[in-house]
């Protein structure tokens, strides 16, 4: 665990000081102090280190030590969801809600209040019949509640009798249209009208107030009925969404209406405004500012306009909200704000400018009073809705996509660290770790794609919440982006050429189409013409002596040799290019198919657009180059964008270089600067441009270096052959092993005598499926002498309390399973004959002779033909030199990258025993059955086998 929790920190602790205390013990990846929501320090913090060793040192040093006057406690953190994690006891931690049981003796304050009210009500009931108490109440009541002409004496009984006739007398004069429309639903209207106190009954109203109340009610009732009917029609068209927005736009009005609903029923109509008029006057306060940036303003609207008229005016558009502006008196001002959902609807609404609505032309323009945050509209998504997918993203289940999004990564981590962490769960197909373009440091999140989705599910369940280099990882399922190549290939209208380019670009990272030192024939011809001060037409002149194809092939061979010499001088290991299945680099790119005369500055400009470059190696002639990036992410971006893209007039062929392509770490900028920018002028001064008939003085060291490298390769090949070959007498059979002895312990004992090639203990499964040792095993050495030495020295040696019984094993060692996947080791040179494969069918034997005769005198050139003996050859041939030295020189020159008629020649050393008579004998044995043996011969062979087995058993008994 590389993450620590530090408890009981002093109150004055700052993050800078906290970081400085622990920075002396290693690289910090996280440093945080914890505070409450109010900003109060909780006296603990977290520290993350890059490695566990650094965290252990810091924990050992600071645990139970003092900072100022506080004794701190330093402990290792637990992973999220760890069952051994201690339970939080702080008051700030979330605790499960448990209902509190009230004590038995205690009573709630609500019960006490109810008891007090009941007691007061009981006392008032007793005093109702008391006349003196009623007189006391009438005297002490408020003057506003009693008429000035009323009698001060107690006159309760007459008032009760007079109230009914008065109301009955004035009931006929009441207007049925003035009945209140705000009574509860389900009650009879006639009963409400008879029970409701009318304006004429209220004595405190004057005649003028009574008339005013009649006028306001009539106007408001008619207008409210019209608006309600229009609103109902609009709401039916818009749906429930508009209702929710209208209700949310005026929450203050709803509160005021709900509070004053009960008060307005008993209040005079003239003293208080109707709710409709009050709502209209209060609307502008909330609707001066547009709610979104997609708002248009309508000016010059009729004063009797409704939302239905606005909807008809803007049809077929469907506005999100319509706000009709009113002044303080509730009158419409002719301005209307209309909100739309996107910018396209706004542009269509602006086309309605100066069109007519109700006999008046309307001006439509964009609202200028828009919030400062221009661009996208407000994010109306809720937290529970999750992230909205982008245009090029599609949602897919983790069990199908196999792609993870990892965040809270340390800024000091690398792609290798992430690959090591996640490759434990399965093979990875892609790892995308974004970096900052300025600082070149990671952004703290990455995308991991597994080859098999079930491995991604396993990694998601185990890695989420784990501590990685001092920080707690957060892993989420990721979305998948649609690849542009698939879209391009799916279009039916695209031409075949575009489809082919998209397919080549998609397969650019595949290793099946890579050729390390590939050179285009057109670029080869240009380079040859520049080298020998000739024209391109002279290079392709078919009337001159010799074949044009052979001439281009020899020119390519010479250029390849110069490129190899240049790469060796610049610290490039050519041995890495010969390994086809080698691991590929993530930062070094081989750039091929460049036009002749390409400059290093042009490559720097092309590739430097995608990131920082390290070394750019461009040999003379400018046909093949090596470009090194400093960051893997930038290298992948350049590879993805530039593969098969047009450079000048030819497509670029890119290939990832093998790992270890540079033998030296420091870049040699001098070589890059010395690269000739004008090869035509500087060719005579360069040693590489010497014609074929002359040999420069500086060429010997390079030849010696090539010979040394070839000698090293031969030694390595011999060692590999020795490892693969199992000589007799190298394997020991060991008995009487302890069942607890492991293969590592046995190998450690026998490796003291010599180099152990393999060590195995025979095991079998029990009923539970557990492998158990059988008490014997085998140890194989590289040489028989080492096995004999171990037999003498370790006979009877005690291992885990058991004396070993050692003897030479006669069984043939079974090859390991991994040997079948090893690369084929090329044959050694035993003769002067070379087997040439992949010969183009249009090539003739004279062209093969012309090509190979450049390196020495030939003995024979044979191209086997088909079975019929007529027509073309079979695509391979044999070239036999007079001497082995000439054959070796030709093999080393032509085996790298020599193309004849566009096909690369593949060279191998022919078998010395393969002759014409041997081939005929082998073919006859394949098609004809061997002659039957006589019975006597078969019996003799059986007797010989039995005698041999008896002698072997006797020797074994003597040894025991």
Curated annotation (Swiss-Prot):
There is a cross-link at residue 481 (Glycyl lysine isopeptide (Lys-Gly) (interchain with G-Cter in SUMO2)). SMART domains: RRM, RRM_1. Expressed in the crypts of Lieberkuhn of the intestine and in intestinal neoplasia (at protein level). SUPFAM superfamilies: RNA-binding domain, RBD. Residues 273-286 have a biased composition (Basic and acidic residues). InterPro entries: Nucleotide-bd_a/b_plait_sf, RBD_domain_sf, RBM19_RRM3, RBM19_RRM4, RBM19_RRM5, RBM19_RRM6, RMB19_RRM1, RMB19_RRM2. The modification Phosphoserine is found at residues 174, 176, 180, 936, 949, 951. Keywords: Chromosome, Cytoplasm, Developmental protein, Isopeptide bond, Nucleus, Phosphoprotein, Repeat, RNA-binding, Ubl conjugation. GO terms for cellular component: chromosome; cytoplasm; membrane; nuclear speck; nucleolus; nucleoplasm. Belongs to the RRM MRD1 family. Plays a role in embryo pre-implantation development. This is Probable RNA-binding protein 19. It comes from Homo sapiens. The gene is RBM19.
């Amino acid at each position: 665990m590389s993450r620590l929790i530090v408890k009981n920190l002093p109150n004055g602790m700052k993050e800078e000081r906290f970081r400085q205390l622990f920075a002396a013990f290693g690289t910090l990846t996280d440093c945080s102090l914890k505070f409450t929501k109010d900003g109060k320090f909780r006296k603990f913090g977290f520290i993350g280190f890059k490695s566990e060793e650094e965290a252990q040192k810091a924990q050992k040093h600071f645990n139970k030590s003092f900072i100022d006057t506080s004794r701190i406690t330093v402990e290792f953190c637990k992973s999220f969801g760890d069952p051994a994690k201690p339970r939080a006891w702080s008051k700030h931690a979330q605790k499960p809600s448990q209902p509190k049981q009230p004590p038995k003796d205690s009573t709630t304050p609500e019960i006490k209040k109810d008891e007090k009210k009941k007691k007061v009500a009981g006392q008032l009931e007793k005093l109702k019949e008391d006349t003196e108490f009623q007189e006391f109440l009438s005297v002490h009541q408020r003057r506003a509640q009693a008429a000035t002409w009323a009698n001060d004496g107690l006159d309760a009984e007459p008032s009760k009798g007079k109230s009914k006739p008065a109301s009955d007398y004035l009931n006929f004069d009441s207007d049925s249209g003035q009945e209140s429309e705000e009574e509860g639903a389900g009650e009879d209207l006639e009963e409400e009208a008879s029970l409701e106190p009318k304006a004429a009954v209220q004595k405190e109203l004057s005649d003028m107030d009574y008339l005013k109340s009649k006028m306001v009610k009539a106007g408001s009732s008619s207008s409210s009925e019209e608006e309600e009917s229009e609103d109902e029609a609009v709401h039916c068209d818009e749906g429930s969404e508009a209702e929710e927005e209208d209700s949310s736009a005026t929450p203050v009005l709803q509160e005021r209406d709900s509070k004053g609903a009960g008060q307005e029923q008993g209040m005079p109509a003239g003293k208080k405004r109707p709710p409709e008029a009050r709502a209209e006057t209060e609307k502008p306060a909330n609707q001066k500012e547009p709610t979104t940036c997609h708002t248009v303003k309508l000016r010059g609207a009729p004063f009797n306009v409704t939302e239905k008229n606005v909807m008809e005016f803007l049809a077929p558009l469907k506005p999100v909200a319509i706000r009709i502006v009113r002044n303080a008196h509730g009158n419409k001002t002719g301005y209307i704000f209309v909100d739309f959902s996107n910018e396209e609807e706004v542009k269509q609404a602006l086309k309605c400018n100066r069109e007519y609505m109700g006999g008046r032309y309307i001006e439509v323009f964009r609202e200028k009073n828009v919030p400062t945050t221009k661009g996208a509209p407000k994010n109306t998504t809720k937290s529970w809705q999750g992230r909205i997918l982008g245009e090029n993203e599609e949602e897919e289940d983790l069990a199908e996509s196999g792609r993870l999004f990892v965040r809270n990564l340390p800024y000091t981590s690398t792609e290798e660290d992430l690959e090591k962490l996640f490759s434990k769960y399965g093979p990875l197909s892609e790892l995308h770790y974004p970096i900052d373009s300025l600082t070149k440091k990671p952004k703290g999140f990455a995308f991991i794609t597994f080859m098999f989705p079930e491995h991604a599910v396993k990694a998601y369940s185990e890695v989420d919440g784990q501590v990685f280099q001092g920080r707690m990882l957060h892993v989420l399922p990721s979305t998948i982006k649609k690849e542009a190549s698939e879209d391009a290939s799916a279009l039916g209208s695209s031409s075949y050429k575009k489809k082919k380019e998209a397919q080549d670009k998609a397969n650019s990272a595949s290793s099946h189409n890579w050729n390390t030192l590939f050179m285009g024939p057109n670029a080869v011809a240009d380079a040859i013409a520049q080298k020998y001060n000739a024209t391109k037409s002279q290079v392709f002149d078919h009337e001159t002596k010799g074949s044009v194809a052979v001439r281009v092939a020899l020119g390519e061979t010479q250029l390849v040799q110069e490129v190899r010499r240049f790469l060796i001088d610049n610290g490039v290991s050519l041995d890495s290019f010969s390994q086809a299945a080698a691991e590929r680099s993530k930062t070094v790119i081989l750039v091929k198919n460049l036009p002749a005369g390409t400059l290093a500055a042009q490559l720097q400009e092309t590739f430097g657009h995608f990131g920082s470059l390290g070394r750019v190696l461009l040999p003379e002639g400018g046909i093949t180059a090596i470009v090194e990036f400093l960051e893997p992410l930038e290298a992948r971006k350049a590879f993805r964008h530039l593969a098969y893209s047009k450079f000048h007039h030819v497509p670029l062929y890119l290939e990832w270089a093998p790992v270890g392509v540079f033998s030296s770490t420091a870049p040699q900028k001098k070589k890059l600067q010395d690269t000739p920018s004008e090869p035509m002028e500087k060719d005579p001064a360069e040693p590489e441009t010497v014609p074929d008939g002359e040999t420069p003085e500086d060429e010997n060291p390079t030849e010696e270096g090539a010979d040394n490298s070839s000698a090293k390769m031969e030694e390595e090949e011999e060692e590999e052959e020795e490892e693969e070959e199992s000589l007799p007498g190298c394997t020991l059979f060991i008995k009487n092993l302890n069942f607890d002895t492991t293969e590592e312990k046995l190998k450690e004992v026998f490796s003291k005598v010599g180099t152990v090639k393999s060590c195995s203990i025979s095991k079998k499964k029990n009923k539970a499926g557990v492998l158990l040792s059988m008490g014997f095993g085998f140890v194989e050495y590289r040489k028989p002498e080492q096995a004999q030495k171990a037999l003498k020295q370790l006979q009877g040696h005690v291992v885990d309390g058991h004396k070993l019984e050692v003897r030479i094993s006669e069984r043939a060692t079974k090859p390991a399973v991994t040997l079948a996947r090893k690369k084929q080791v090329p044959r050694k040179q035993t003769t002067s004959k070379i087997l040439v494969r992949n010969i183009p069918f249009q090539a003739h034997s004279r062209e093969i002779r012309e090509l190979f005769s450049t390196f020495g005198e030939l003995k024979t050139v044979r191209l086997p033909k088909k079975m019929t003996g007529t027509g073309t050859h079979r695509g391979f041939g044999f070239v036999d030199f007079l001497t082995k030295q000439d054959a070796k020189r030709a093999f080393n020159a032509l085996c790298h990258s020599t193309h004849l008629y566009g096909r690369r020649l593949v060279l191998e050393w022919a078998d010395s025993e393969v002759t014409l008579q041997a081939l005929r004998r082998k073919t006859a044995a394949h098609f004809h059955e061997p002659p039957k043996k006589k019975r006597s011969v078969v019996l003799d062979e059986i007797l010989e086998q039995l005698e041999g087995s008896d002698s072997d058993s006797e020797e074994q008994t003597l040894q025991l």
